[in-house]
From Swiss-Prot:
Residues 54-82, 110-129 are annotated as: Disordered. Residues 56-65 have a biased composition (Basic and acidic residues). RNA polymerase is composed of three subunits: PA, PB1 and PB2. The keyword Glycoprotein does not apply. It is found in: Virion; Host nucleus. Keywords: Host nucleus, Virion. This is Polymerase acidic protein. GO terms for cellular component: host cell nucleus; virion component. The keyword Glycoprotein does not apply.
Length: 688
């Protein structure tokens, strides 16, 4: 809201006409990179310059009729015949007179060149370093008819006006070049107004600083410009609605000041009504980039650093840091089991571990067939109760699940596991179904149509991020230890294929015993429930990432639709047969993720073996449906499948450690054998 008042000023047609804003503002090169405050201040300057000029006509020119009134303010008021009413003989005479002046000047230049070649002569040259320029010095040496000057003068922006506007005009730069070339004025600056009677280049300023100081800066900035041909019209703003003009450089009063004074007064009133506060420091302040006193002190402070001198080592008597003691560090750690709080940690994983799930044995191979088996086992959604969640939100989630099950079952008849979602003028709808409040609420549960507004660059009051508190400490509970124990239970079969841990061929002499040790670790992983949990995670994230990649490659365009997929892990028997163990299903919302942190919304349904009390103790934010089905919403990031689809690679750390035991036995056994192998006698058997 800091610049909103200035945006309203620009949009106010009582201050700035739309055409003026377009020509002087939007079409300018600086408009796109400035904020609203600087844009409005630039328009204010152009508007003041425009009001100060074009109010006083010049003296009658040779193109005006003799009977035309002297007070005519514009050449456009005269008729076309009146503008052309002049004598052709008089014009030819003026041209001949100009040609004679030019020939005389050329003769003078040749004579001066001859005198310079013969030798400097102070009497002939007219003074050392004196140069002749046509149109400037010639006026002092011979009289040139004023009609010639008027004839050569450029006809720019109503030539019958005394003042010509340069600021904010597309051709202003070229107009200034024409005037300065005609009058013989050298300048490197861009000016705001031109007084065509007194041949003055005028700078206009609206400032809150003392006018005298501003004029000194204008003079310094205009170094190289003839002081007789420049001046400044400085308007002082006291920030209270009063504006006082000051003239510098012997310029005439600008007759447009009454109109120009009314404009900033009205602008000040509108700014106050919009809640803006007039402040100093605008674009015309032109504050110096540095202060001489400050820079001098800075140079004096830095100067000793460059002087060479004796180097003396500073004595440091500070106490030294003690070596890190892991035993002492552990004693400083807080025991989470002893925290005095009623809140305990809950399971935050996207899907449940295998030891908490009930499985449905299936021989199906296609996802759509496995999903139908899960839906048949789920049956009709009946009783449910919220678990550590808001009952109102949970009710919406369960209702959305029931509606989605009905919609997906309609698609299963055509072997279609997707629900197409499109956006229309009235909102998001499901293809083939009328828009109803129930379907709208169902889509909202998967994030469809949830974003209430589109991102824009407009500053709003509620854009400030909410304050965040420290992470709340929770109490350690026994279910974490129990989970580690249950995940270590044997599975009765093996997950994953034998070639999942296939290693590169090597001929090192110690590779064979190292491979035997790693193979035992792999077998332990594949034959226990932790391996089944990892297999379940890998299958889920592989589908999420693979679906996204196929959509990017163009082979599948279903990433913008609702999709349903099963949750399961696969076991292998000794005879080579395989079995799929279904634990639930996932409904994936439509997504167009681009950044790595963009999310994909999910509705997850899993069959659990936890009792109501255990679910209340361990799970967070969901509903227990029909007593055994755990239902909740969640989301994953775009980058998650990149790593979690290859979760088995986490075994690299322990297997690499075992490889170090084999490849460096002397160092390891000498240093750590009593401490590690003494507590793990089974490892000694492996080393044998």
């Amino acid at each position: 809201m800091a610049f909103e008042a200035y945006r309203l000023l620009i949009a106010n047609p009582q201050l700035y006409e739309p055409d003026f804003v377009s020509q002087a503002g939007e079409l300018s090169e600086h408009w796109a990179r400035e904020n609203w405050k600087r844009r409005e201040e630039s328009l204010r300057h152009d508007k003041v310059c425009m009001l100060l000029m074009n109010t006083e006509p010049r003296e009658r020119s040779h193109t005006q009729a003799e009977g035309e009134e002297e007070g005519s303010s514009s050449r456009s008021l005269a008729t076309e015949e009146g503008e052309k009413r002049f004598s052709l003989e008089a014009l030819e005479g003026l041209v001949d007179q100009g040609r004679e002046v030019l020939l005389e000047n050329l003769e003078m230049e040749e004579a001066q060149a001859n005198s310079d070649s013969e030798g400097p002569n102070e009497a002939d040259s007219g003074g050392e370093g004196e140069e002749f320029v046509f149109g400037v010095e010639s006026e002092s040496e011979m009289e040139v008819a004023s009609e010639v000057t008027k004839l050569l003068e450029p006809d720019l922006i109503d030539s019958n006006f005394r003042y010509t506007l340069l600021e904010g005009v597309t051709s202003g730069k070229f107009a200034q070049m024409e005037f300065t070339a005609l009058w013989g004025i050298n300048t490197n600056n861009k000016w705001d107004l031109v007084d065509r009677v007194n041949r003055k280049l005028i700078e206009v300023k609206v400032t809150t600083r003392p006018p005298t100081g501003v004029w000194e800066e204008v003079v310094a900035h205009a170094e190289g410009t003839d002081p007789e041909h420049n001046g400044a019209y400085i308007i002082h703003d006291d920030l209270c609605g009063n504006f006082t003009p000051y003239k510098f450089g012997n310029i005439s009063d600008l007759p447009g000041w009454p109109s120009a004074q009314d404009f900033p007064i009205r602008r000040h009133a509108f700014l106050a009504s919009y809640g803006g506060v007039p402040s100093a420091g605008g674009i015309e302040e032109g504050l110096p980039a540095w202060d001489d006193v400050f820079m001098e002190r800075t140079r004096n402070w830095v100067a000793p650093l460059w002087k060479k001198g004796p180097i003396s080592v500073r004595r440091d008597d500070c106490p030294r840091m003690e070596p890190f003691n892991i035993t002492k560090f552990i004693t400083l750690l807080e025991d989470p089991r002893l925290r005095n709080t009623d809140k305990s940690a809950k399971w935050k994983g996207k899907i449940l571990p295998v030891s908490w799930c009930r499985t449905i044995i299936s021989s199906q191979e296609k996802d759509i067939d496995m999903v139908q088996e899960v839906i048949r086992d789920l049956g009709v959604i009946g009783l449910w109760e919220e678990i550590n969640a808001n009952p109102v939100k949970v009710e919406r989630t369960v209702s959305a699940l029931s509606e989605l099950m009905r919609l997906f079952q309609e698609g299963f008849r055509e072997k279609n596991p997707y629900i197409s979602v499109k956006r229309k003028c009235k909102g998001w709808v499901i293809t083939g179904h009328k828009q109803t409040p129930a379907l709208t609420d169902t889509l909202l549960e998967l994030g469809v149509g949830y974003k209430p507004y589109q991102m824009s660059n407009v500053v709003e009051e509620d854009m400030r991020q909410c304050e965040t508190d420290d992470i709340e400490k929770m109490k350690w509970v026994d279910w974490m230890s129990k989970l580690a124990a249950t995940e270590s239970e044997p599975l009765g079969s093996k997950v994953s294929r034998d070639d999942i841990f296939k290693e590169a061929e090597s001929r090192h002499v110690l590779d064979e015993p190292a491979k035997k040790m790693c193979s035992k670790v792999y077998d332990l992983y594949r034959s226990h429930k932790i391996g089944a949990t990892c297999s379940k995670f890998m299958g889920f994230y592989s589908r999420m990432g693979g679906s996204y990649l196929r959509a990017i490659a163009g082979n599948s365009r279903q990433h913008s639709s609702l999709a349903i997929m099963p949750l399961y892990y696969k076991t292998y028997q000794e005879d080579g047969t395989s079995t799929r163990h279904l634990t639930g299903l996932v409904i994936r919302g439509p997504h167009h993720v681009r950044e790595s942190t963009d999310t994909i919304n999910l509705l997850i349904v899993e069959k659990t073996c936890l009792s109501r009390r255990e679910a209340q103790e361990r799970l967070s934010g969901g509903a227990l449906v029909n007593g055994v089905w755990w239902v909740r919403k969640n989301a994953i990031r775009k980058a998650d499948p990149t790593y979690l689809a290859f979760l088995h690679n986490s075994l690299f750390v322990p297997t690499n450690f075992l490889g170090e035991l084999v490849t460096t036995p002397k160092h390891f056994l000498r240093q750590r054998q009593p401490r590690i192998l003494g507590r793990n006698p089974v490892w000694q058997l492996w080393l044998l």
